[in-house]
From Swiss-Prot:
Residues 107-183 form a coiled coil. GO terms for molecular function: zinc ion binding. InterPro entries: Lnp, Lunapark_Znf. This is Endoplasmic reticulum junction formation protein lunapark. The gene is LNP1.
Length: 278
């Protein structure tokens, strides 16, 4: 028993050391990568600033050198041309050397960054191997999000979602059947309307639509005058205002409901009747 307890204690300590070691290593590598990224971004702005300063001071020194040459040699043109060429050449040489120096340091930083990223990726791969991440993640993904949905959906879904899944499969089967029948002998309008009614019911979250059932929340809109059946549905508990496109008969259930409420209320006595009672 004591040996088992000792193994358990050593195992827990090893796990803690394992996590601490990888956390420290990955944190250090990530910090170095971040510092190099920041240095690379700053170096470009520093180079631009140095280039602009070098251009400004180089032009200023060139003007001073030409002025001194003009004053010393009394405007002798060959000396002025040589001085200008030397100053401009020196300026170009310094700018080229600065660019090369920046490229040298920048390439070194890029190589360090690539090396650190490779070490970081290698550490992660080693961590995955030691923790069996690839095997466990595939199992977790299968049973949490349902990789094999046809098998796992029947296990994980409750009865209501399972019933909805069966309804959708039935609609899919009926659609394939209707397609075959329409190619052979054509599809009747009544059958297509019934199938679309079922689709509306499933998408609305209810069962099959039945305008004659008192339990259905939906009812098909039918004109009471000419008995024209529309392809529209309404909520049975909500009043509507509808004008039939065939006979122009108007259905105003809002007004009918207000009239019914007023009829149920007791009639208020007039002012003369109140005075007589007094």
């Amino acid at each position: 028993m004591f040996s088992a307890l000792g193994k358990w204690v050593r195992g827990s300590r090893n796990d803690k050391d394992f996590v601490t070691k990888y956390t420290a290593d990955l944190s250090q590598i990530t910090s170095q990568i971040h510092q190099l990224d920041v240095a690379l971004k700053k170096s470009q702005s520093i180079l631009s600033q140095w280039q602009s300063n070098l251009t400004f001071y180089g032009i200023a020194l060139t003007v001073l050198a030409l002025s001194y040459t003009y004053w010393e040699y009394h405007g002798y043109r060959p000396y002025l041309v040589v001085t200008a060429l030397l100053c401009i050449g020196s300026l170009i040489l310094f700018k080229w050397a600065l660019t090369k120096l920046y490229a040298f340091y920048n390439n070194n930083r890029l190589r360090k960054l690539a090396k650190l990223r490779a070490i970081h990726q290698k550490k992660l791969e080693k961590l995955k191997e030691e923790t069996h991440y690839n095997a466990t993640s595939s199992i977790i993904q299968r049973f949490s999000s349902g990789e094999d949905q046809n098998d796992d959906a029947m296990v994980l879904l409750d009865d209501e979602l399972n019933a909805k899944y069966q309804e959708l499969n039935n609609l899919k089967t009926e659609l394939e059947k209707f397609k075959k029948e329409s190619h052979v002998k054509g599809l009747k309008k009544e059958d297509s309307d019934a199938w679309f009614d079922k689709i509306i019911s499933v998408l609305a979250g209810g069962n099959e639509l039945d305008s004659t059932s008192s339990l259905s929340p939906f009812k098909k809109i039918i004109c009471p005058q000419c008995h024209w059946k529309s392809n529209c549905y309404r909520l049975a508990s909500k009043p509507i205002i509808f004008i039939c496109p065939h006979c122009n008969h108007k259905i105003d259930e809002v007004k009918e409901r207000e009239d019914a409420i007023e009829a149920k209320q007791p009639a208020q006595p007039s002012q003369s009747e109140k005075e007589k009672t007094k």
